[in-house]
C-alpha cells in the first residue's frame, strides 16, 4: 500500500484554507456595502441643461421658462394638500348628458371598512423647515422672483398679451417669462417660523383638477409644491384632466412630467364631469393617508405642509384649510389677502366670513376652528373622507360641495380648522372670454337643494325663501344614499351646528334683513342739482355725480343708496358698496363688492351735520370736489357744504343707537 504524499496533503490543505478565508472576507464585504447604482431622486429630478418644453408662445403650445436644476430629494417621496375671493370652478364648454364617471374611467374604489390610524405622539416634535432650500431661494434673481409684480417691456406684444389674458383670465404671456421655480415672499406670521410640529406626519396625495389650464401656470403649481414639501411626506401628485381640449395638455404635458418629475401622474377623464366628479375620481385614485385638494393655479409657500397635517395627525376626523394668498392675475404679484376669518354662508348660499374670536386673536400662529370651508384648498384624512361618503356625486359640475362637506364634517363627529402657518398663493382670475355653460337647466340650485334637503333640516326654508321661487321647480334627485349616510353615522342636527359651531352666523347674516338706517338718493348740499351716481359703471369703478332724480326718496337705481344694517353704504338690493382703499387726502371712492366686515366699507350718517362719515373713528367724510365733480373722502369739516348730504329718508332713532350691537329676534 502506497504511503500518502504528505507534501501534497499539506499544500492542498493550505490552498483550501486560503480559499475559505477569501470567501468569508468577500462575503462579509458584500453584505456591509450598500447597493450604489445611480441614485434615485423622487419628485423633481435634476434637469439637463436644455430639458423641458420650449416653443413660441404665438403657436398653440406655450413656452415654459426653463426650470433650474432642483435639490436632490430623499427616497420614499410622499405628498399632501381656499375666503370670500376663492373663485368658483370655471364653467366649461362641452355639453354632456351623464355627469358621473364612465365605466372606463380609471378608478380606485375605497375599502368598505376603513380603520383609523392611531393618533401621532404630540410630545415628539421637530423643525420641518428646509433652511438650505430657503437660503437658496432667497438668492434667486429674475422676473417675478420673491413674488414681485412683473411686466413685459415689449410693446409689440401688447395685443398678444391682451388676447392671451382674455383666453385664460390671467396674464399667460407674462407667466411664460417667469420661472416655474420662482421664489415667493415668506409672509407668514413671525411665530410660524419658530414652530415645530409632530415628528411623525402622515403621507399625502395632492389632487389637482384642471380643465384647459395654461401650461406654465399648471407646472408652476406642481414645481412649487414639490420644491417646498418634505419629500418623505409627498407620496404623489395626481393631476386630473377633466377632458381638456387644448393640444399642449396632451402629449406635451406628459413629456414634461416624464422628464422632470416622479410620483406625478395624470388621470384622464373620458368625458367632462365638472369639479365635483373630477375630484371624486382623483380621490379614488389616491393612495396616501391624507388627501389634499388644490386648484390648478397656485403656489405653495414655505413649510406649508406640516401645519396643514399636524391637526390631522392628532385627530384623523379633522379637515384643515390653508390661508389663501393672492397672486395678481395681471402681474403675478404674490401678497397676503388678510390674516384670517372664519368661513360662513348667507341665505343665498354665497360664501361669507365671520370675524376671528378673541381667543383666536391671542394665538395668531395656531389653527382656529372654522364652520365652513371655501372649498378650493383643503386637507382631509382619506379614511375620514370615505367614511363620510366622499363627495355627493349627485352634485353636478360645481356649487354646494363645500357646504355639503363642511356640514358632514362637523355634524358627523369631525372638526375643521384654518391653519395660519400654511399659506398658498392663488390666482383669482380677471376678465375672461365667455365660457358656455356645460349643462342645460339649473344645476346650481339643484345642488343647493340636495344639500339643504339632506343636511339643513328646518333651516332649509330660510334658503328657499331667498330663491325667488327657483327651488320650487327644482328636483334634487334621489337622496336615499345621502340620507342613509347621515343615519348610519348618527350625525347631529343642523340646529346643533348653528348653535354650537356657527353660533354667530344668524346675527351676522340674518335670514331676514333688518330695516336699513337710511335710503334714497344722496343729494349734495353744496350743489343741490347733483346726486351721488354710479354713472352706469359696474363695480370696481370710481363713483361720480349726476343730475338728481325728481324724487330723492325713490330715485332711479343708479342713485338709490341704502345705509344697511351691516353699516355699509350700498346700492339698494345689491351687494355693491362704497369702498375707500387709501387713507390719503382726496381718497377716491369706489364701488366694490360688499364684504360686510366694516373696515374700509364702514359708513355712518350724522344727520345733525348731514355728513357721511367713513370708518369707525369718523374722521373722514364723503366730499364732492366742486370743480372736478369727483367724489372723495377727506378729513371731516362741518363748515364744508360739499361734505354735507341730504339722504332721501333716514331713521333718527336707529341712527342714535348706531354703535349698539343688533339684537335680532329670529
UniProtKB/Swiss-Prot annotation:
Molecular function GO terms recorded: carbohydrate binding; metal ion binding; polypeptide N-acetylgalactosaminyltransferase activity
Catalyzed reactions: L-seryl-[protein] + UDP-N-acetyl-alpha-D-galactosamine = a 3-O-[N-acetyl-alpha-D-galactosaminyl]-L-seryl-[protein] + UDP + H(+); L-threonyl-[protein] + UDP-N-acetyl-alpha-D-galactosamine = a 3-O-[N-acetyl-alpha-D-galactosaminyl]-L-threonyl-[protein] + UDP + H(+)
UniProt entry keywords in alphabetical sequence: Disulfide bond, Glycoprotein, Glycosyltransferase, Golgi apparatus, Lectin, Manganese, Membrane, Metal-binding, Signal-anchor, Transferase, Transmembrane, Transmembrane helix
Disulfide feature: 192-421, 412-491, 531-548, 577-594, 621-636
Glycan attachment residues as annotated in the record: 181, 285, 651, 657
EC number(s) stated in the UniProt entry for this protein: 2.4.1.41
Annotated positions binding Mn(2+): 295, 297, 426
Residue intervals passing through the bilayer: 12-31
Cytoplasmic domain ranges by topology: 1-11
Coiled-coil annotated residue ranges, if any: none
Cofactor: Mn(2+)
Principal place of residence: Golgi
Gene deletion effect: RNAi-mediated knockdown reduces viability.
Cellular component, GO, one term: Golgi stack
Pathway(s) the chain acts in: Protein modification; protein glycosylation
Membrane-related topology note: Single-pass type II membrane protein
A Pfam family this chain is assigned to: Glycos_transf_2
Tissue: Expressed during oogenesis, in the somatically derived follicle cells that surround the developing oocyte, which are involved in the maturation of the oocyte and construction of the egg shell, as well as playing a role in subsequent embryonic pattern formation. Expressed in the salivary glands from embryonic stage 12 onwards, becoming stronger at stage 13. During embryonic stages 12-13, also expressed in the posterior midgut and hindgut. During embryonic stages 14-15, expression continues in the hindgut.
Residue ranges of domain Ricin B-type lectin in the record: 518-648
Subcellular location: Golgi apparatus membrane
Enzyme class (EC, first level): transferase
Stretch list, region Catalytic subdomain A: 201-311
Record family assignment: Belongs to the glycosyltransferase 2 family. GalNAc-T subfamily.
Record note on domains: There are two conserved domains in the glycosyltransferase region: the N-terminal domain (domain A, also called GT1 motif), which is probably involved in manganese coordination and substrate binding and the C-terminal domain (domain B, also called Gal/GalNAc-T motif), which is probably involved in catalytic reaction and UDP-Gal binding.
Function: Glycopeptide transferase involved in O-linked oligosaccharide biosynthesis, which catalyzes the transfer of an N-acetyl-D-galactosamine residue to an already glycosylated peptide. In contrast to other proteins of the family, it does not act as a peptide transferase that transfers GalNAc onto serine or threonine residue on the protein receptor, but instead requires the prior addition of a GalNAc on a peptide before adding additional GalNAc moieties. Some peptide transferase activity is however not excluded, considering that its appropriate peptide substrate may remain unidentified.
Protein name (record): N-acetylgalactosaminyltransferase 6
Organism ancestry: Eukaryota, Metazoa, Ecdysozoa, Arthropoda, Hexapoda
Gene: Pgant6
Amino acid at each position: 500500500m502506497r504511503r500518502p504524499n504528505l507534501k501534497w496533503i499539506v499544500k492542498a490543505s493550505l490552498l483550501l484554507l486560503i480559499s475559505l478565508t477569501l470567501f468569508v472576507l468577500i462575503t462579509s464585504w458584500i453584505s456591509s456595502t450598500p447597493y450604489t447604482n445611480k441614485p434615485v431622486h423622487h419628485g423633481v429630478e435634476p434637469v439637463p441643461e436644455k430639458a423641458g418644453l420650449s416653443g413660441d408662445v404665438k403657436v398653440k403650445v406655450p413656452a415654459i421658462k426653463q426650470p433650474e436644476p432642483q435639490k436632490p430629494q430623499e427616497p420614499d417621496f410622499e405628498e399632501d394638500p381656499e375666503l370670500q375671493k376663492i373663485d368658483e370652478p370655471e364653467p366649461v364648454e362641452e355639453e354632456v348628458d351623464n355627469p358621473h364617471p364612465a365605466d372606463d374611467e380609471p378608478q380606485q374604489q375605497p375599502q368598505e371598512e376603513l380603520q383609523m390610524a392611531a393618533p401621532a405622539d404630540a410630545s415628539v416634535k421637530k423643525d420641518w423647515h428646509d433652511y438650505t432650500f430657503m437660503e437658496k431661494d432667497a438668492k434667486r434673481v429674475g422676473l417675478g422672483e420673491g413674488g414681485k409684480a412683473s411686466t413685459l417691456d415689449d410693446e409689440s406684444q401688447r395685443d398678444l398679451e391682451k388676447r392671451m389674458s382674455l383666453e385664460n383670465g390671467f396674464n399667460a404671456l407674462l407667466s411664460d417669462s417667469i420661472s416655474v421655480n420662482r421664489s415667493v415672499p415668506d409672509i407668514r406670521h413671525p411665530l410660524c417660523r419658530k414652530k415645530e410640529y409632530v415628528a411623525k406626519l402622515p403621507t399625502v396625495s395632492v389632487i389637482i383638477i384642471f380643465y384647459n389650464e395654461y401650461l406654465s401656470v399648471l407646472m408652476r403649481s406642481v414645481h412649487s409644491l414639490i420644491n417646498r414639501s418634505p419629500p418623505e411626506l409627498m407620496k404623489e401628485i395626481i393631476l386630473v384632466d377633466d377632458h381638456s381640449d387644448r393640444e399642449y395638455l396632451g402629449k406635451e404635458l406628459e413629456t414634461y412630467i416624464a422628464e422632470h418629475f416622479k410620483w406625478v401622474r395624470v388621470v384622464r377623464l373620458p368625458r367632462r364631469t365638472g369639479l365635483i366628479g373630477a375630484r371624486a375620481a382623483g380621490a379614488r385614485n389616491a393612495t396616501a393617508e391624507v388627501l389634499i385638494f388644490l386648484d390648478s393655479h397656485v403656489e405653495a409657500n414655505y413649510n406649508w405642509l406640516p401645519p396643514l397635517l399636524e391637526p390631522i395627525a392628532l385627530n384623523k376626523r379633522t379637515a384643515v384649510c390653508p390661508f389663501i394668498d393672492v397672486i395678481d392675475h395681471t402681474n403675478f404679484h404674490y401678497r397676503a389677502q388678510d390674516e384670517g376669518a372664519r368661513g360662513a354662508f348667507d341665505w343665498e348660499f354665497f360664501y361669507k366670513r365671520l370675524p376671528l374670536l378673541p381667543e383666536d386673536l391671542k394665538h395668531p400662529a395656531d389653527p382656529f376652528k372654522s364652520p365652513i370651508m371655501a372649498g378650493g384648498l383643503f386637507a382631509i384624512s382619506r379614511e375620514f373622507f370615505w367614511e363620510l361618503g366622499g363627495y355627493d356625486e349627485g352634485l353636478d359640475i360645481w356649487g354646494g360641495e363645500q357646504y355639503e362637506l363642511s356640514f358632514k364634517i362637523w355634524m358627523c363627529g369631525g372638526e375643521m380648522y384654518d391653519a395660519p402657518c400654511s399659506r398658498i398663493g392663488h390666482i383669482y382670475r380677471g376678465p375672461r372670454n365667455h365660457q358656455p355653460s356645460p349643462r342645460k337647466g339649473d344645476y346650481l340650485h339643484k345642488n343647493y337643494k340636495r344639500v339643504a334637503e339632506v343636511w339643513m333640516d328646518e333651516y332649509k326654508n330660510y334658503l328657499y325663501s331667498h330663491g325667488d321661487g327657483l327651488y320650487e321647480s327644482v328636483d334634487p334627485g334621489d337622496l336615499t344614499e345621502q340620507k342613509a349616510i347621515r343615519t348610519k353615522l348618527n350625525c347631529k342636527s343642523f340646529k346643533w351646528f348653528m348653535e354650537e359651531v356657527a353660533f354667530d352666523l344668524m346675527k351676522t347674516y340674518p335670514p331676514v334683513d333688518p330695516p336699513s338706517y337710511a335710503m334714497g338718493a344722496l343729494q349734495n348740499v353744496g350743489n343741490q342739482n347733483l346726486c351721488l351716481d354710479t354713472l352706469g359703471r359696474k363695480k370696481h369703478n370710481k363713483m361720480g355725480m349726476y343730475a338728481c332724480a325728481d324724487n330723492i326718496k325713490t330715485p332711479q337705481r343708479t342713485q338709490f343708496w341704502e345705509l344697511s344694517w351691516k353699516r355699509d353704504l350700498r346700492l339698494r338690493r345689491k351687494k355693491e358698496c362704497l369702498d375707500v382703499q387709501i387713507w390719503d387726502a382726496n381718497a377716491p371712492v369706489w364701488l366694490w363688492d360688499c364684504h360686510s366686515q366694516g373696515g374700509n366699507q364702514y359708513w355712518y350718517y350724522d344727520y345733525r351735520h348731514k355728513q357721511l362719515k367713513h370708518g369707525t373713528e369718523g374722521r373722514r367724510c364723503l366730499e364732492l370736489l366742486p370743480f372736478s365733480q369727483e367724489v372723495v373722502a377727506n378729513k371731516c369739516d362741518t363748515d364744508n357744504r360739499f361734505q354735507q348730504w341730504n339722504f332721501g329718508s333716514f331713521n333718527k332713532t336707529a341712527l342714535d343707537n348706531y354703535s349698539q350691537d343688533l339684537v335680532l329676534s329670529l
